[in-house]
Structure formats: structure tokens, C-alpha cells
């Protein structure tokens, strides 16, 4: 008897951090994984690692903000394997600056990833998932889209766009068998802070009691959401507590964030 084909997952932002860790874990869990990011060399390294461990992988280097390029990737995935039953949107770019400190190119880049990248990949495979009557879209969100802090204007706006995409998709998909999930992580020990060494000091002091999470732990959380889809997930639990504090006492929470965050 021929064994069933392994399911297909697309992971954006797969060249490092949460995306790379998630791709490794999905491959080890029996998924055929499509790696998506802009850095071709890093993708090839990860693809080689996954193949050496016995996994099935495709590496697609592109700017996911380019809708036409995403469509071409989608066609290649369908041709080589099958439409994916999982899309993990972990691509994200950005600098934490006041708006007047941010140049137009940086603003466009931050809208490109995460928002346009997620919208393009969800759109590319939406019809396939609806026809199959199932599938999952998981988006990696930022606390900045829950409780904005000062000094990260364009970054925050781009994360709110991703949150809006998820919330709209969730409503669109009710009763279809296709799910949209938003997973919020606190600070993650990834390359972001190495590439943006001054950004850590801009996190409001009120967020200092939320522990740092590793990309590998984030990947485990995401795999848990694959197995049991939920609309919104917070990790670690202290982040959920802060979110509830913001909902119950919005004015005091905003005051604390403003007072302990970056100032002009």
C-alpha cells in the first residue's frame, strides 16, 4: 500500500530566527517544507540541513512583498508537490524609530514584511484551501500591535496591518474549515536585536518583566497551534497578563507605557 503524501507547509522569514526554527521543527514532524526568504544563501544552508536530516524541502528566495513573484512560487509548489495545508507568516522587517527618523524606503520595507508578504501568500493559496475544505494560516505577531509604544511608529503601524489581516481573515473563514491564527511573542533571542542593537533600549520598562523566548520555543508554540488551531495565542503567559491589564485598565496601561518608553 502506498503511504500517504506528507503535508506541505510554507514558512516565510525562514532564513533565520522563528522562521528557521519552525521550518526545522515542521520538517522533523513530517511536513514537506517550502522555505521563503530574501537571503538565498541562508535558505540553501537551511535546506541542506533539513535534507541531511531526511526532510523534504524547497527553497524559494524572493521578496514576498512582490505579489507576482509569490504567484510564481505558488505555481512551482503546486507543480512539484501539492497546494500547502499550512502557511506560517513569520517574515518581518523593521526599525524602531519615530516617524520623522524613518525614511520612505524603510516605511515601504516594513509594510512589505510582515503585511504584504502575509497577504500575498494567504491569497496565493486561499482558493486551494477553500476547495480542500481545510488548511491553516498562522501569523507571527508583535506586542506592538496590541499596546503601541513610543518611538516605533512605522514598525507599529505595519504590525497593526498584519493584525487587521488576521482578524478580517478569521471572520471571512468562519465555517470553511480553514483557520487563521495570530501568535504573539514577547522578546525573542534572534538576530533582530543583533542587527538593530539600539532597539532593545526602546522597549518600555513595563515590558521588562516578560521573559525572553528562544526561536526554538516559539517554533514549539507554533506547532502546537498547527495541531490545535486557536484565533489568538500569547507566549509567554506574562504577555497575556499584560494584554488583559490593557483591556481592563486601558488608561493606566497607556500611561505606564508612555512614561517608561522612549521620549522625544
Residue map of PLM features:
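The beta1-alpha1 cofactor-binding region of Rossmann-like NAD(H)/NADP(H)-dependent oxidoreductases
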Residues: 61-72, 104
Amino acid at each position: 500500500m502506498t503511504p500517504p503524501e506528507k503535508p506541505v507547509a510554507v514558512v516565510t522569514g525562514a532564513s533565520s530566527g522563528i522562521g528557521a526554527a519552525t521550518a526545522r521543527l515542521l520538517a522533523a514532524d513530517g511536513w514537506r517544507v517550502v522555505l521563503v526568504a530574501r537571503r538565498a544563501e541562508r535558505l540553501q544552508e537551511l535546506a541542506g540541513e533539513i535534507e541531511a536530516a531526511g526532510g523534504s524541502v524547497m527553497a524559494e528566495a524572493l521578496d514576498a512583498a512582490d505579489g507576482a513573484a509569490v504567484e510564481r512560487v505558488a505555481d512551482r509548489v503546486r507543480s512539484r508537490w501539492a497546494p500547502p495545508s499550512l502557511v506560517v507568516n513569520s517574515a518581518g522587517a523593521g526599525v524602531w524609530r519615530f516617524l520623522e527618523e524613518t525614511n520612505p524606503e524603510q516605511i515601504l520595507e516594513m509594510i512589505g514584511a510582515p503585511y504584504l508578504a502575509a497577504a500575498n501568500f494567504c491569497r496565493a493559496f486561499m482558493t486551494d484551501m477553500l476547495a480542500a475544505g481545510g488548511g491553516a494560516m498562522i501569523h507571527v505577531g508583535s506586542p506592538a500591535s496590541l499596546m503601541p509604544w513610543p518611538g516605533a511608529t512605522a514598525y507599529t503601524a505595519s504590525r497593526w496591518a498584519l493584525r487587521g489581516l488576521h482578524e478580517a481573515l478569521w471572520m471571512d473563514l468562519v465555517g470553511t474549515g480553514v483557520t487563521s491564527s495570530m501568535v504573539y511573542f514577547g522578546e525573542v533571542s534572534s538576530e533582530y536585536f543583533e542587527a538593530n542593537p539600539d532597539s532593545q533600549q526602546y522597549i518600555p520598562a513595563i515590558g521588562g518583566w516578560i521573559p525572553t523566548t528562544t526561536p526554538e520555543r516559539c517554533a514549539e508554540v507554533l506547532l502546537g497551534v498547527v495541531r490545535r488551531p486557536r484565533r489568538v495565542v500569547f507566549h509567554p503567559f506574562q504577555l497575556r497578563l499584560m494584554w488583559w491589564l490593557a483591556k481592563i485598565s486601558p488608561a493606566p496601561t497607556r500611561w505606564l507605557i508612555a512614561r517608561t518608553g522612549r521620549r522625544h
